[in-house]
Amino acid sequence: MSATEIAVEAAGWGGAALILLAYLLLSLGRLTGQSPLYQWMNVAGAAGFVVNGWWHGAIPSAVLNVIWMLIGGIALWRILARRAASEVPDQGPAQ
């Protein structure tokens, strides 16, 4: 097995582990769907599946995981934007 093949398989198995761990932590109440860590785990896990699926010619799986990444990325962006907006100090009334 070449180094590339090993990296592709590691990406797939690592992606699977991340997505399963994210779901386990969500199900146990250790993370919420609004947790940046939960969303990052899903985005990174899906990226591993995209690499593995594309390499093996599993295009439907790769496309599904690109969409999964987009959903997670958008959710993460919204979570972080909300968090940043809530940290802006109140300027008070204009003088």
What are the roles of these predicted feature ranges?
Residues 59-87:
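C-terminal structural segments of small proteins and small subunits
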Residues 85-95:
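Short, charged juxtamembrane terminal tails flanking transmembrane helices
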Residues 1-8, 54-59:
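Helix-coil boundary and interhelical linker segments in multi-pass alpha-helical membrane proteins
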Residues 5-17, 63-69:
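Structural signature of hydrophobic alpha-helical transmembrane segments
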Residues 38-48:
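Hydrophobic alpha-helical membrane segments
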Residues 20-28, 47-54:
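Alpha-helical transmembrane segments of multipass membrane proteins
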Residues 28-39:
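Short, amphipathic, aromatic/basic-enriched membrane-interface segments that mark the entry/exit
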